[in-house]
Regions:
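Short alpha-helical interface segments
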Residues: 1-45
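Acidic/proline-rich low-complexity IDRs
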Residues: 9-12, 38, 55-57, 88, ...
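Generic low-complexity, intrinsically disordered sequence content enriched
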Residues: 14, 43, 60-62, 70, ...
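Single-pass transmembrane signal-anchor helices and their membrane-water interface zones
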Residues: 22-39, 52-85
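Amphipathic alpha-helical interaction segments
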Residues: 36, 43, 62, 246-248, ...
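A residue-level detector for the "anchor" residue at the start of short, highly conserved motifs
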Residues: 69-317
Length: 317
C-alpha cells in the first residue's frame, strides 16, 4: 500500500474535528513512519496473490486501530493542556454540541447549523448564531472570525471583562447586552443594554462608545470611519438570540421574577397591570422560547398579554 492509499484509509480519522492541525499532522506522520518500518521488516510476497491483499487489509486495520489510539491520546492531551473557559448552556439545532460540553481556550468553535449559548466562569454569557466561527484565546479574549455573537454581561453579577476581537475592531463591554455581526467586510455592533467601547485596529489609545439603542458600523472599504445609527431593543436582528434563552426554573418563582427574566431575554419593556407580581408559578418552561413561555404562563394563571411596539402589558382579564 502506498502513501496515497494509506491516507485514504485513514482519512475519516485524520479529519476528525477538535484536534489542532499541527498535532493531527504530527500524529499522522508518526503513524506513516511506523507503517513503513513495519512493511520494511516483512518478507517479499508476490504482488498478485490473495495472501498479499489479505495481509495489506489486515495491516490497514491494525494501523487504523493504532491511529485511533493516537487520536484518543491527542484528545486527552488537548483537554488536559488547555484551560476550560466556558460550559455549553443551551443548544438549538444541529448535533455537534451538547449541554454541559466544555469549551477550552484555543478551541476552534464552528457552529454550523447550531445556535449555541456558553456560560463563562464569571457568569458572562456568549451566544453564537449558526454559521459562526470563533475562538477564546483566554478568559478575557474572544476572536470572532465570522458570524454573529451576543454577549450578555449581567450587571447584577461580577462579570470579568471580555474583549471581542475582529480584524475591523475590538469591542469591550461596560455591563451590557450587545450583538456583534462580522463577515470580514463589515463589522456591526448593536447595543441593547448598557455601554460598549469599540476600538479600531490602528487606534490603541482611543475608542468610540455606544449606548443602549445605538449601533456602530465599520467597513473594510473605509476602516477609519464609524457609522452610528439607532436600533430598537426588539429589532428582528435580535430574534435568533431567544432560541437559546438562559434556562430558568419557574417552579415556585413569582410572576414578577419571571417577567424580569422575560424582559432581559427579549428586550421588551413589561408593564404589569392589575396582575399580582407575587403570584407563584409552577411547572416547567424547558424548551420554550421566552414568548412561548409567557403565553403558557398567561394561560396557566389566567392573564392577558397585549403587545404594542416594544412594550408588553400583562394584566388580569
Amino acid at each position: 500500500m502506498n502513501d496515497e492509499e494509506m491516507k485514504n484509509a485513514l482519512q475519516s480519522l485524520r479529519d476528525r474535528p477538535r484536534v489542532p492541525a499541527d498535532r493531527r499532522e504530527a500524529a499522522f506522520e508518526r503513524v506513516r513512519s511506523e507503517w513503513q518500518a513495519a512493511l520494511a521488516t516483512q518478507p517479499a510476497i508476490p504482488a498478485r496473490t490473495p495472501t498479499r491483499r489479505w495481509a495489506l487489509g489486515l495491516a490497514a486495520s491494525v494501523m487504523i486501530v493504532l491511529f485511533s489510539g493516537v487520536f484518543f491520546w491527542m484528545s486527552r492531551d488537548t483537554a488536559s493542556s488547555h484551560t476550560q473557559i466556558a460550559t455549553v448552556l443551551a443548544v438549538h439545532g444541529g448535533n455537534a454540541f451538547r449541554i454541559d460540553d466544555r469549551i477550552y481556550d484555543q478551541q476552534s468553535i464552528k457552529t454550523g447549523p447550531t445556535t449555541l449559548s456558553m456560560r463563562m466562569a464569571s457568569g458572562l454569557v456568549v451566544r453564537a448564531a449558526p454559521n459562526s466561527e470563533l475562538r477564546f484565546s483566554d478568559e478575557g479574549h474572544l476572536q470572532l472570525e465570522q458570524g454573529r455573537i451576543f454577549v450578555d454581561s449581567n450587571p447584577r453579577e461580577s462579570n470579568a471583562p471580555l474583549l471581542v476581537e475582529t480584524e475591523l475592531g475590538a469591542i469591550r463591554h461596560l455591563g451590557t447586552q450587545y450583538l456583534v455581526e462580522y463577515d470580514r467586510e463589515r463589522l456591526n455592533v448593536a447595543v441593547r443594554e448598557g455601554v460598549i467601547a469599540l476600538q479600531k485596529p490602528a487606534e490603541t489609545r482611543s475608542s468610540t462608545t455606544a449606548a443602549a439603542g445605538e449601533q456602530l458600523i465599520v467597513t473594510a472599504n473605509a476602516p477609519q470611519a464609524i457609522e452610528r445609527s439607532r436600533i430598537s431593543a426588539t429589532d428582528a436582528r435580535w430574534g435568533w438570540v431567544e432560541t437559546v434563552a438562559s434556562p430558568i426554573d419557574i417552579d415556585g418563582m413569582t410572576l414578577g421574577a419571571f417577567l424580569q427574566w422575560y424582559e432581559r431575554e427579549t428586550g421588551h419593556r413589561v408593564t404589569l397591570g392589575n396582575a399580582d407580581a407575587n403570584t407563584r408559578l409552577s411547572g416547567s418552561i424547558t424548551g420554550l422560547t421566552p414568548d412561548d413561555a409567557l403565553a403558557a404562563i398567561a394561560v396557566a394563571v389566567e392573564l392577558t398579554v397585549a403587545q404594542k411596539d416594544d412594550e408588553v402589558v400583562v394584566s388580569k382579564p
